[in-house]
Curated annotation (Swiss-Prot):
Gene3D superfamilies: Glutaredoxin (3.40.30.10). Belongs to the AIM32 family. GO terms for biological process: cell redox homeostasis; protein-containing complex assembly. This is Altered inheritance of mitochondria protein 32. It comes from Candida glabrata (strain ATCC 2001 / BCRC 20586 / JCM 3761 / NBRC 0622 / NRRL Y-65 / CBS 138) (Yeast). The gene is AIM32. GO terms for cellular component: mitochondrial intermembrane space; mitochondrial matrix.
C-alpha cells in the first residue's frame, strides 16, 4: 500500500516502540452507539456510497517508511485565526496542482524517498511564526524540531540540506505508485555528504513539545474534510486546558477509509546529543475518542484499537 510517494509497511518489530504500553480499550455499548451515530451523521453529508465510513472495518497496522518529515506551512495568519481553512478552500486534491504561493514551490522540492512531504495549516501553537509573505516559504521539519524560513532562490540549497544522507527521489506521479509501476524505498546514500546551512536560510529550534496533526484534506477526501476540523475542535475544547499545545490540519496521509486520521509527534529525551521524536499514527478517530487517545499518549500508553503504527525518528 502507498500514500503519495511512500510505501506503507506492516507494523513490525522494527517499528514497535517499547516506550509505550499498548492496551486494548474495552468498547462500552454507549461508546459504540455514539461512534456509529457519528459515522451515520458524516455519511449523510457524503454523496457516493464508496465514500461512506464503515464503523466496523478493521484498522490496518501500516505506517509510511520515512525518517524525515517536511511540512510546508500554509497561510499562517488565517490558520492561526481559525477562519475558514486553506484545507477546505485552497488545497486541491493534489497539493502540487496549486499554483499560488506557497504551493508554487513544490515542483522545486526534490526530496529523497526517505523524506515525507505534506502541507499543513497550523490552528494553534505556543510557537510564534512570521506572517505569511510572498517572499518566503515556511516549513516545519521533524525530527529536526525546527521551523525554517526560506527565500525562493535558496530552495534548492534547502532541498540539498534536507536530502543529506538520502538518494534524490525520481520524478514520479502518485498514479505511478498506485499502479505499482514504481516502488519507493528508503535509501541511504553513503556517498552523500551531510550539509550544513549558512546564514541565508533562517531556522529556529522549536520548543520541546508535542505536535498533533489531523488529516482534513477535503478535496482529496470529503470524509477527512468533514471530520478533521471537528476532531481538532474536540482536542482543543474537551478539557480545561488543551491536551496538545501545537495542532494543525495536514494534507493527505492515507487511510481515508479509516477516517479520521491523526499523527502525533512526541519529542523524547535526546540520545547521544541527537534529537529523537516519536511518530505515532492513529485511525478511526472521532471527536468522541480523540481526547482519550491523546491523553493516553501523554501518559505513555497507546490505545491499540486505533493505532496504525509508529516510528522513532
Amino acid at each position: 500500500m502507498v500514500i503519495g510517494n511512500r510505501v506503507l509497511l506492516p507494523l513490525t518489530k522494527r517499528y514497535y516502540n517499547a516506550r509505550y504500553r499498548k492496551v486494548l480499550h474495552p468498547e462500552l455499548r454507549e461508546e459504540i452507539i455514539a461512534h456509529n451515530c457519528y459515522c451515520e451523521e458524516v455519511n449523510s453529508k457524503l454523496h457516493f456510497d464508496d465514500e461512506k465510513i464503515d464503523p466496523g472495518i478493521s484498522l490496518k497496522t501500516a505506517v509510511p517508511s520515512y525518517d524525515k518529515h517536511v511540512m510546508l506551512i500554509s497561510d499562517i495568519n488565517r490558520g492561526m485565526a481559525k477562519k475558514p481553512g486553506v484545507w477546505k478552500n485552497i488545497w486541491e486534491s493534489r497539493i502540487e496542482n496549486n499554483t499560488t504561493h506557497p504551493y508554487d514551490i513544490i515542483s522545486k522540492l526534490n526530496f529523497g524517498p526517505g523524506v515525507l512531504f505534506n502541507a499543513i495549516s497550523i490552528t494553534s501553537s505556543l510557537e510564534s511564526f512570521a506572517p505569511t509573505s510572498l517572499e518566503f516559504y515556511d516549513f516545519l521539519v521533524m525530527p529536526d524540531m525546527r521551523y525554517y524560513r526560506v527565500k525562493k532562490p535558496d530552495i534548492e540549497k534547502f532541498s540539498q540540506y534536507i536530502n543529506s544522507g538520502h538518494a534524490v527521489a525520481p520524478k514520479l506521479s502518485f498514479s505511478d505508485y498506485l499502479s505499482g509501476k514504481a516502488a519507493a524505498t528508503t535509501v541511504s546514500n553513503n556517498n552523500q555528504i551531510t550539509l550544513s546551512l549558512d546564514d541565508s536560510i533562517y531556522y529556529r529550534e522549536l520548543k520541546n513539545d508535542a505536535w498533533l496533526f489531523v488529516c482534513g484534506h477535503e478535496k482529496r477526501d470529503m470524509r477527512c474534510g468533514i471530520m478533521g476540523p471537528e476532531i481538532l475542535h474536540s482536542v482543543n475544547t474537551a478539557n480545561s486546558k488543551p491536551l496538545v499545545n501545537n495542532t494543525g490540519i495536514i494534507s493527505h496521509i492515507g487511510g481515508h477509509k479509516f477516517a479520521g486520521n491523526i499523527l502525533i509527534y512526541k519529542p523524547i529525551e535526546n540520545q547521544n546529543g541527537r534529537k529523537k521524536v516519536d511518530s505515532l499514527w492513529f485511525g478511526k478517530v472521532t471527536p468522541f475518542n480523540v481526547s482519550e487517545i491523546v491523553q493516553s499518549v501523554n501518559e505513555g500508553v497507546i490505545i491499540e484499537n486505533n493505532f496504525r503504527g509508529g516510528l522513532s525518528l
